[in-house]
């Protein structure tokens, strides 16, 4: 999109945010940032804090485009996408199938691996079956299958004699199905895809945190983004290729972001492992995709305008 083109469209954009998942606060932050910037671009914007009446609200509102700033279940698992397909309202990001598939970490990993993407060893389990015995040799990671923003992620270290009790306790709020994945040491890297183009690779360096968890993602100053990442050119290109391959294999549209581990402790070439793909990457002031776009010379306003103009049904 050319600079200033949005001001000539006059499109009415409904920004969906909030919702009722565990990532509600993140979604509100993304939604407010996106709505404010789209208004500055000249779009007519309506902000919708999503509840169970969202379909009737959209029918009455009749927007030209829905900008989906929801995160977590209902917002990025194919549910709201199905509603928008039924209502025939063009929307941003991925469609029903890709959203549902990407939200399921285990199944998304199998599809990516079948396309040639290198993934970590893992197994799908019911959390109650983990019990007091390690399901695999530590270190390993226990992840809820259908959560984002690192909610419920537990790292089990080599010196822990038993799995953490919280996994099987009543305090666990992230569903019974979990993925147990071998822990991959090394650097946190991520790569966004915009349309059919892999963008820059970014290194995430949490400040004072063991890994890129909820706080290091969304607390200002809790992580540093190095973009472009300082890695060998062939490794850089390999990560871009893997991100684009996963994006295509899963059937993503618009913008996605793939996360990686790069273990270069023993050699510069190291080992690159794909962890997961995010079809609704954060758009908060501390989020990665806006930083990656900025490194490519694309402003936040230009990124959002491109996403609005890219919106469609049958995605």
From Swiss-Prot:
- Please state the protein's primary subcellular location: cytoplasm
Question: Which residues are recorded as binding Mg(2+) 2?
Answer: 276, 278
Q: Where does Mg(2+) 1 bind?
A: 259, 276
Quote the cellular component terms of the Gene Ontology held in the record.
cytoplasm
Which key words are in the record? ATP-binding, Cell shape, Cell wall biogenesis/degradation, Cytoplasm, Ligase, Magnesium, Manganese, Metal-binding, Nucleotide-binding, Peptidoglycan synthesis
Record's InterPro entries?
Answer: ATP-grasp (IPR011761), ATP_grasp_subdomain_1 (IPR013815), D-Ala_lig_Van_CS (IPR000291), D_ala_D_ala (IPR005905), Dala_Dala_lig_C (IPR011095), Dala_Dala_lig_N (IPR011127), PreATP-grasp_dom_sf (IPR016185)
Cofactor comment:
Binds 2 magnesium or manganese ions per subunit.
Q: Part of which pathway?
A: Cell wall biogenesis; peptidoglycan biosynthesis
Pfam families associated with the record: Dala_Dala_lig_C (PF07478), Dala_Dala_lig_N (PF01820)
Q: Does the keyword Cell membrane apply?
A: no
Origin, by domain of life? Answer: Bacteria
- What are its cofactors? Mg(2+); Mn(2+)
Instruction: Write down the EC number.
Output: 6.3.2.4
Where in the numbering of this chain does the ATP-grasp domain appear?
Answer: 109-309
Provide one Gene Ontology biological process annotation. peptidoglycan biosynthetic process
Please name the GO terms that the record assigns under molecular function: ATP binding; D-alanine-D-alanine ligase activity; metal ion binding
User: What reaction(s) does this enzyme catalyze?
Assistant: 2 D-alanine + ATP = D-alanyl-D-alanine + ADP + phosphate + H(+)
Which residues make up the binding site for ATP? 135-190
Give the location in the cell. Answer: Cytoplasm
Query: In this entry, which stretches build a coiled coil?
Result: none
- Report the protein's function: Cell wall formation.
- Family assignment? Belongs to the D-alanine--D-alanine ligase family.
Q: What is the protein name stated in its UniProt record?
A: D-alanine--D-alanine ligase B
Query: What is the source species?
Result: Brucella melitensis biotype 1 (strain ATCC 23456 / CCUG 17765 / NCTC 10094 / 16M)
Q: What would be the name of the gene that encodes this protein?
A: ddlB
